[in-house]
Amino acid sequence: FIRYIFEKLAGFQHQDNRQESVVEQIKHYINDHLKEDLSRKTLAGSVYLSEDYVSKIFMNVTGISIPSYVASCRMQKAQEYLKYSTFSVSKVALEVGYSNFSYFSKTFRDYTGCTPNEYRNRVTKKQG
């Protein structure tokens, strides 16, 4: 009986490791393709699994949804571009996967508490 319990626990551990591995693959894909469409279908296809399963394990492993993770990665990358590049704000929006500048600005403001231009002005003042 004890052996059976250990075998079951080992199976769960293996499943957890597999899920974590899949989530890491998805995270890498997201970070390598921020400029592109990152729909559930695209991400599921990148790891050859169903959309529902990918969404479920991503939430189980990370505690956040895929769209929330994608938005967070895009906003972090946008902050880097605004701080270290001379790209226009509209170019930054395109580089992080937003074709709609207004939506990018609203999302950025919601994420950081300021507009992209305000953010750039703040961080360049601190550097100067």
Language-model segments: what does each one mean?
Residues 54, 58, 103-104, 108:
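Short hydrophobic/aromatic patch on the recognition helix
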Residues 24-28, 32, 37, 60-99, ...:
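Terminal helix-turn-helix DNA-binding modules in bacterial transcription factors
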Residues 11, 18-22:
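Flexible loop/N-cap segments at domain edges
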Residues 41, 52, 88-91, 101-102, ...:
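Residues within helix-turn-helix
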Residues 106-128:
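…primarily DNA-binding HTH/wHTH and HhH modules…
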Residues 17-18, 36-42:
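Conserved short strand/loop->alpha-helix "switch" segment adjacent to the catalytic nucleotide/phosphoryl-transfer site
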Residues 1-14, 53-55:
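An amphipathic alpha-helical interaction segment
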